[in-house]
Amino acid sequence: MMYKKQNLPELTLRGLILGSILTIIFTASNVYLGLKVGLTFSSSIPAVVISMAVLSLFKTSNILENNMVQTQASAAGTLSSVIFVIPGLFMCGYWSEFPLWQTFMICLCGGGLGVLFTIPLRRTMVVESKLAYPEGRAAAEILKVANKDQSSKKGKQGIKEIALGSFIAAIFSLLSNGFKLAASESNFAFIWNKMAFGFSMGYSLALLGAGYLVGLAGAIALFVGMFLAWGIFTPYLSNFEFDSTKNAVDLASSVWSSKVRLIGTGAIAIAALWTLIELLKPVIEGIKEIVKNVKITNQEKNERTNIDLSLKSIFILFVLMVVGLFITFYSFVEDANLSIYYQMLFSFVGTLVSVLIGFFVAAACGYMAGLVGSSSSPISGIGLIGVIISSIVFLVLGVELFQDPMLSKFAVALAIFTTSVILATAAISNDNLQDLKTGHLVGATPWKQQVALLVGCVFGALAIVPVLNLLYQAYGFVGAMPREGMDASSALAAPQANLMSTIAQGIFHHNIEWGYMAFGVFVGILMIIIDKILKGTQKMSLPPLAVGIGIYLPPAVNIPLVIGGILKYIVMQHLTKKYAKNSHKEEKLASCEQRGTLFASGLIVGESIFGVIIAGI
């Protein structure tokens, strides 16, 4: 650890202000991207680079202050994962507008619990373990390298990459979405032998940037999913629904949205669960091994770099958040006009399920983040398990009550509402230990980082609520438009939220077309087997979750993602050849890859922020 023996300023007013601004910016970007394609990007490295550039203007800035800014801002990328669930409340027809304070409390209390639950795990999982924590180590390395360069050239160069990407994407977004001078997508379709073949091309620089971050394996998997959906499933199924009065675009879109998407839902579900199952054994074994080997002396306990938030502080915050959750659940349940008995019962059980499942997923997600990285951790799998457990619990409690169609809709909404809290807890715990690893490597004070994360939760929650509302009012969600006459093609897909809503409705209403979902599960299992075989060759992989997403998302979204992933491969291959004989080859390649990552992040931020601004106008 670099600064273990020094006592440098860490939690500063300027750092908190900068961290709060970055939290709001990256939260808005991630909410937009997550609703559009079901992906979010890690904000840690862009936050580190921006922080270094801005704080270099102050002579007294230091590496630990920079670390606190990225710790706070990183909450944006993770807390915004609640958008994988919350839109489901609109898709199931229960909400027609956002209750702002309920949404805020879900994010705040769920995220806060995620921070608190992982504090006791810091020493065992961060200090004593040999887990990789890839994003945490990467952020620490950037901080260390930049700190050696007192002129902060690295930070200034990095912020130029982000700014350039943001500017280009914002201009294009202004032309296409603002002035409508450029098309945002093009649709092509034709009918052959009573089978409809469709294709659409999206022109989104944010998606291009996201594809660059996804990489080649993810791009190929998305392409495979897209080919299955539009080259096989849609043409085959459209043959049975051929209508000469429909044009090719309408027929293909109708079959894909009503049937093929359910196949994608099944594939996503089994792939997410498989990822979770695959990690279960190493998670359990790893935690056992870590706990067995933990040893700490009294001297170490008193060192600055070993001090967490006190048990008293944790307990007080825990009680406040549980009480806040209970009040939020009661407010939600009260709208259903149930008897006081059921109001109290569902409020208590909803809070209990959120806290108990949240505790277990916090440990699991923290370990998985260390094992495979926050970006690869199967958060959607956690959400899937959460909505299934919540639905079953409430179905058992109100089996007779929920025979009423209106109350059945309420039950679906309650299960989704509960899952949103669980996912907020999982998302933050997924990121918390990653940040603490960065702090451990540079010599930060743990309790100060934990405070920064809690502050990040507050500002992240404040940003998520209005941004969600703006985007919903401007674009709507698939199957849930705020007003009549809106362009359904511009609706935000929110694929994971649609999946959660579909599963919950299937459990309570018994009206889901399980046949298509079952076939999707079969497709997912087939992709898992193929992925295993390919990994055995050690040359490539085919992420099954990405295949499912490729089936579920429209080509207008998939194609830019695929192009972005292929583009990264081409660029890195060119650079590998260019620096083949360079004595600093690895360092050069790492620097170029980081610049590409920052530029791609800038594309996402530029278009996303502009999309939010246009929505507000």
Role assignments for model-derived ranges:
Residues 1-617:
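Alpha-helical multipass membrane-protein architecture
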